[in-house]
Each structure stands twice: as structure tokens, then as C-alpha cells.
Amino acid sequence: MNTKETIKGKVTAVVGQIAELRFEGAEPELYWIFTTPDRSVLLQVFQSVEPKVYRCMVLKGRDVLCRGMEVTSNEERLKVKVGKNLLGRVVDIFGMPVDGGSEIVADQATEVLGDSPHYKKVRSEKKVWETGIKVIDFFSPLVWGGRIGLLGGAGVGKTVLLAEILHNVVTTHDGHSDNNRRRVSVFAGVGERVREGHDLYYELKEREVLKDVALVFGPMGENAAVRFLTAMAGVAMAERFRDWHGMDVLFLIDNVYRFAQAGSEMSTLTRTIPSEDGYQPTIGSEMANFHERIASTDRGSISSIEAIYVPSDDLLDYGVQSIYPYLDSIIALSRDVYQEGRFPSIDLLGSSSSMMTPTVIGEKHYEAITKARSVLKLSENLERMVALIGESELSPENKALYHRSKIIKNYMSQPFFVVEDQTGRPGVYVSLADTVDDVLNIVNGKFDNIPPEEFLFVGSVKNKVPAPVEATHEQITTQAVPVN
């Protein structure tokens, strides 16, 4: 029987979050974990400096770490607790509860830094996963096994939108079987505020949907290594639900940019020469390792929704650009839309999906989105004219077109369940079928006699808007704008 050798090292230097270890005998491999006998200190091997000398990230116990301290390793990497006992609980990357509850007894533990599934085992399910949020389901639908990114600067509503998606999916789908599979959700909070995690936890608990969600947090107060590994730990939990329990998993992460930022901080701490825009030279491989683990197999699926902070609203930032290649759909949150008071503040034309094909979303949905994007695109050209001479000076055809574009924009606003106590408006869930029917009615001119303001923060039009009369404007034929 193979027994793992105990590797011993001695701390020779401690600089902030970095500890240097010297070894007299056998040397460690990258990412091995070293601890003290009482496990008050936890170090992860990160970099080889010279023969027998290695730099380690201090994951735990920086206050008690000192020069001359001996640490040992059993040739193991960092593991996180996984399994059904994590559902309804909040943990850190060490599997310790941070929700004030009892200790978690997990049936298994798995390595945080795992490998992606073999490409022969990866399966692609071309099926839309409904969220009940009109603008997402219509313009950038989530597909089983797909990845969708919520891009936006500070304070435009990424976290609220992510929380609403989680609430709707859990309420509507989780805990119910589909093709003999149970659906669960995993939420990874990476580098964000503790308050946001606190609010999310109690919102889910209050609505009695926490039992189908596992949460792992590494808030901004933690060091860079812990924040970086929290994202990987979340994926490891999702993989276990997929591979061992045969579940369909919705994986949500807030925020992927903080994951990239944590990697950059780690690179700086280890004195690695940066690459473009000051980011770590390994950012490409780190993003690949993270995203390629989010996949579907014969056993189950992982679908991800990723909040992505855009620093200074610069979409060309290299940290943001490094995420793009792995996304199937992009939802762009706009500060201009936010200032206009339409929530969720999503740029309708700036959002896109590679899944927008008739074979995936259906002929009717494809027709509706093609017409809607055409109306929105053509109305952009009229906005400058309206700003100069006013809407009343437009031709009847252009006036009807501009009117319909405003209706579409207002219709895509929606009251959310997770902020009911703040807005005073009850949340609304709208099915995709209703959304498609409503948009077709709008672009076909059936609501031309109704003011656009009537469409703000409503659910389905058939329930909230008075019965339409025949349009008074001529039918407008618009040239279709290709859907990205």
C-alpha cells in the first residue's frame, strides 16, 4: 500500500501574505498545503524561488506565523467539503460554516484546483433555461450548460440582477426533477462586500428557497489567495453535484473580475513581471482553467451566470477582455439606462447571445427578436433628430417607429422580488412565451395608441395594459438587423 511521505519545511521569511520555506530533504510540488500540528497555520506552495526555497501563500494564521516555525505536508492539495449537506449553508474555502450554524459534516472532500472534464465527455444541451426576467430570456437567454456574463460598472445593478435570477430559478426550478435530475444552485461570492452576501442569505432564507442553494464566500476583506481560491472552490462544489449526484447545477459567481484581480495581486506579491494592463501573465490560463470546468456531461450539467465588474466602465480593460471568449451570452448593464430610471438597466442592443438561432430558441422567438432589434436600431438614428426638432416633427412612419422603440425599452423594465421592500412594487415573473407574444404585438403596432409610460415596471402586457385598439399609423416595414 502506498503511503504518503511527510514533507517538512522551515519558515525563513514572512512578508505580508507571503512566507518563504526552506527544505533540507525532499521538495514539495506546487499547490501542496503545509500546516502546523494544530492547523492554526495553512500555507499553499505557489512558486519556486531557488533550489530548496519556495514561496507560499498564507491562507490562514498570518498573525501567528513566524520565522523558524516548522510546517509539514502530507503531499495533499487544498480540499473543500462537498455534498448535499452543503445545501442551505454558507461556508468558506476551508469548509467552515460562516452562517452561525453548526459544523458541517460532509460526506466527501474534493480538491479545489481540479481538472476540466475530458472533451469526449462534454455534452452540449441546446435548451433554454427560463429565468422569468423578460430582458434576459428575450435578448440573451441562458442555455443549459452555457455561460452568461453580466457586465457593468460600479452601482448599475449587477448584484441585484444576479440575486433575482437566483431567486427566480430556485423558486421555479430547484428541488424539482427534470429528466430524472434534480436542480440545485451554487453561489460563489468572490471579493465583494460582506453586506451583499448577508442580504442575499437572509433574502433566500426568508423566501424559503435556501435549502436548494450552497453558498461559498471569500469577501473583499480576505487576502488575495483566499479570494482567488473561492471561485475555484465554488466550481468544485458544482462539479460534485454534477458528477456524483447527477444534478443540473446553476452556478452563480459575483464577481469574476475580482477573481482576475486577486490573481493579479498574487502575481504582484510574488514579484512576477506583469503583462498587458498590469495583469498577471497567467491570466489567460487561469480563466481557461476556471471556465472549462463549467461544462455539461452525461451525468449532469453546470450552467453559469457570472457578474463581471467593468473598471471605470472600460469594456476594453484586459481583465474584462480575458473573460469574453468563454461566454455564450453577454448582458451589458448601462449607466445611461440606469440614469433614465429603467431597471434592470440593460443595454438592449449591447446585449447578445451566440445561441440566438431558430434551432435553439424557436422560429417565433427568433422572428420577434429580429423585429425588435430592427426597431431599436432604426430608432437610434431618430434620437438626434428628436433632440433637435422634437418628436412631433417626425413623419408618421418615423413617429410610430420611435414610439414603438420607447414601448419596447419600457416594457423590458420589471419589478424584482428581491427588492420589493425597497421599491414598494411586488415582484413579477414573466414566462418567455408571454414575453415573445407581447414583443410581437408591440412591433406590429397593436399598442401604438398607448403612452410608453404605461409599460414601465409591468409584467405581461395582457395583464397590465388596457386592451389595445387597431393601430392608427401605417404598418412599418423595417429591414431586419442581424442578431449577433
What are these regions (language model features)?
Residues 1-89, 94-98, 473-479, 484:
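N-terminal accessory targeting/assembly segments
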Residues 64, 240, 258, 265-484:
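Conserved catalytic/coupling modules of large nucleotide/cofactor-utilizing molecular machines
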Residues 69-71, 85, 98-146, 160-164, ...:
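P-loop NTPase nucleotide-binding/switch module
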Residues 152-153:
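The Walker A (P-loop) glycine that initiates the GxxxxGKT/S ATP-binding motif of P-loop NTPases
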Residues 157:
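Conserved glycine(s) of the Walker
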Residues 176-179, 183, 192-240, 268-284:
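Nucleotide-state-sensitive switch-loop elements of NTP-binding domains
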Residues 182-185, 211-214, 246-250, 299-305:
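Loop/turn-to-beta-strand initiation segments
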Residues 225-263:
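Phosphate-binding/switch loop-helix module in NTP-utilizing enzymes
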